């Protein structure tokens, strides 16, 4: 196997309303987006941000910050703000098949309206169970790879194939034991808010995480997904990743990409996935 390509993907996981009201969470969303925009402006943030598979985050933000529309459109056009494919993350068993299709159509349409190219990552990692037609529905939009977590066996196996009721297949990345929060908890220690940041410890934790993912992933492409429940970008840990990318350990190359770029690399090695 040639050098392992580590794909760092920056995201969040956003419930519009959960243990706080919609407006309380929107207040936090505005902060999150403002901090991202500032990071791109001052050069500390050097890659794309994935909007949790949804476009509604951007809609909610622009309702509160309409003056930011031109900046959002510029970021979308440049590929730094990656939206969709969903309008809003669905529950597959509470809505009809028609609703799922229209949800995807609306999300992709909005992403284009804001100047972006809608994500082709079938992002359904936090849904409590899946229906057998999802690969078929995704394929109708040219989406041939996705990301899951809940309800999937073999937590130490990252890549598998999902076959729909009609025989349509898609390649699936399965998040680890803690799901999309793996990196956030094991490297950023976001579940320990009082823990002081330590760059050296951050680098040690990062490489332990990467090497664990390498063991669980058959392809050269490895995913480091930085996104947890309502979490913002963390400039300190991001700086550690950038520093390590300049002189990575032997056998690894580190970059900041998107879910689309990661899945495209995985698809190229699809023959190794069963």
Whereabouts are the PLM-identified features?
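Catalytic-domain carbohydrate-binding cleft regions of carbohydrate-active enzymes
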Residues: 1-274
